[in-house]
């Protein structure tokens, strides 16, 4: 049986915190910032926590053995 590997795309975009939650960067922050309000841009700077239902799926991709 070959070794199970974590999904590389998921590994680049998500990280697991010490408490076990899945953290990710907000989207829509790459370019075309002039259309977006300053309030929205400030909110998008912060990283977000994935919902509990989605984090279970993501943990299986990041840590296939765990």
Swiss-Prot record:
Keywords linked to the UniProt accession: Ribonucleoprotein, Ribosomal protein
Keyword Ribonucleoprotein: yes
Coiled-coil features, chain-numbered ranges: none
Pfam families according to UniProt: Ribosomal_L35p (PF01632)
Keyword Nucleotidyltransferase: no
Superkingdom of origin: Bacteria
GO terms under cellular component: cytosolic large ribosomal subunit
Gene3D superfamilies xref list: 4.10.410.60
GO molecular function term, any single one: structural constituent of ribosome
Gene Ontology biological process terms, A to Z: translation
InterPro entries reported in the protein's UniProt record: Ribosomal_bL35, Ribosomal_bL35-like, Ribosomal_bL35_CS, Ribosomal_bL35_sf
UniProt cross-references to HAMAP family, sorted A to Z: Ribosomal_bL35
Family membership noted in the UniProt record: Belongs to the bacterial ribosomal protein bL35 family.
Protein name: Large ribosomal subunit protein bL35
Species of origin: Treponema denticola (strain ATCC 35405 / DSM 14222 / CIP 103919 / JCM 8153 / KCTC 15104)
